[in-house]
Amino acid sequence: MSHIDTHSAHGPTGPGLESPPPHPAAGGHDAPPPVSPRRRRRHLSPLNERRWRNFRRNGRAFWSLVIFAVLFVLSLFAEFIANDRPIVVSYDGGIYMPVFNFYPETAFGGDFRTEAVYSDIEVQCLIRTGGLEDCFYEPDRLIAEGAVAEGAEGGWMIWPPIPYSYDTINDLGGAAPSAPDAQHLLGTDDTARDVAARVIYGFRLSILFTLIVTVLTSIIGIVAGAVQGFFGGWTDLIFQRIIEVWVSTPSLYVIIILFAILGRSFWLLVFVTVLFGWPALVGVVRAEFLRARNFEYVRAARALGVSNWTIMFRHMLPNAMVATVTMLPFIITGTISTLASLDFLGFGLPSSAPSLGELTLQAKQNLQAPWLGFTAFFTFAIMLSLLIFIFEGIRDAFDPRKTFQ
């Protein structure tokens, strides 16, 4: 009888039947609200959270990342920081954006259909006065008096903090290069271009070049090293012989020949650098996969029928990331040095490109202008130091001895 009462009190149970879950209020505690899949995806895994905490504890690496991120983001908006075109122009009640669009001089009451030279005093007078024809004769007086054409509205311009682009040739009134002054904070180079503007654009160019090359070389190197280490045998042997022949190819001669045939360009230089840079990671990744291929979890995955590519890149690659991340600082600094060296030798980007290597070459050719050498040196020193500190912190954060202590 007691057995029947107990059975009826708790509802039907038995094989294949489960009692209904208790009401949240029955136990005296509210059940936690369900977590949506979108919110779950936002959170890092416990392992990555430990790595992030370890990175945050490294003050030098964390603040280097902050400073570098700020500098890089600012350089992405270089056109709004250093440009020989105004950011916004108001002319006769209309708004123009010369940073993004082409406007002929006729759009502001001028005579030419070529692009307006906004630094010319005549063009500035036309914009400010609403298109007075006397701007071609007495622009300074009309601007000083604030004259406005009849029936028109006075205009205005908002300039970037540095009113010169990286390729703007300035009228110095003297010999170039010129020393730093109020108009050119870091002076000008030997073709009268503003050094500060070229440093801003050159920093962006160097970092973008380095990021593109590093990502592409890392992908190719990791895949090649993983295939060699995982499969071993003849696959490893053949790949190793190919790599030995490939790395013995004189890359500088190949670059000179390709540039002589195809001309110098940014993407061609990226292609050639990736072409000869991917073997840098192969040896490290190959060694990690050779070491891990006989571990128990790899054998278990094979026994369960997991595909080779899933084992390689979902299970084995995370364990090889420490050694891979350790090599990244060398790849990044090497890529920056490669770009600067090629530009210094004249085999890199076109001479008109805002390159830090070209600035270094100008410093060598103009020893009487020490500001060129100081600017190039401190730019390289700051950029490379920040990157090394950042990846040093990343390497420590990925170190299992610190992650699981």
Residue ranges with predicted function:
Residues 2-218, 222, 352, 362-378, ...:
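Gly/Trp-centered helix-boundary motif
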Residues 188-405:
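Alpha-helical transmembrane segments of integral membrane proteins
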